[in-house]
Amino acid sequence: MPDEIYYDNSATTRTREESAKLVYEMLTDCYGNPSSLHRRGFLAQQRLDKAREQTAETLGCQSGEIYFTSGGTEADNIAILGAARAQQRMGKKIVTTAIEHDAVLNTVKFLEGEGWEIVRLKPDREGKITAQQVLDAVDNQTVLVSMMAVNNEVGTILPIEAAARAIALKKAPALLHVDAVQA
């Protein structure tokens, strides 16, 4: 029997040996700033480009569509603020859920202070958001629907596909932002 049973893998998972070795290699052999013009910077940029290409291939998109950030909070901020600013001429309504990560909730609260309408869908007793809730909330003024794929506290799987269908059905100009950090 193990000394410890670890139940927090959704927050942080033990690093695989292969990953730890690669991180060590990058920290000791490839430590150049990828924006620098010297040899170490060039090598770091090559490794970064390769990682971007591998990620794009895995996701089935173009390498120019891949952005590396410091973590989920920064990524959520960039996605939500960027989408809101880009879409604001078509409406100023964002649909999200009341059970999002603080990275999302704080960002939409900031936008609310700027006059945006924020609809926060409330979960049922089991922590679930229904497809009907999303469908009812989305309209032609909705420019963004932001929801996590899996809730970071209770593990609820949110209706991402239903959100995409609701946007299409309502012909809303909305983009769909999915925080998949816990998925």
What are these regions (language model features)?
Residues M1-A183:
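Pyridoxal 5′-phosphate
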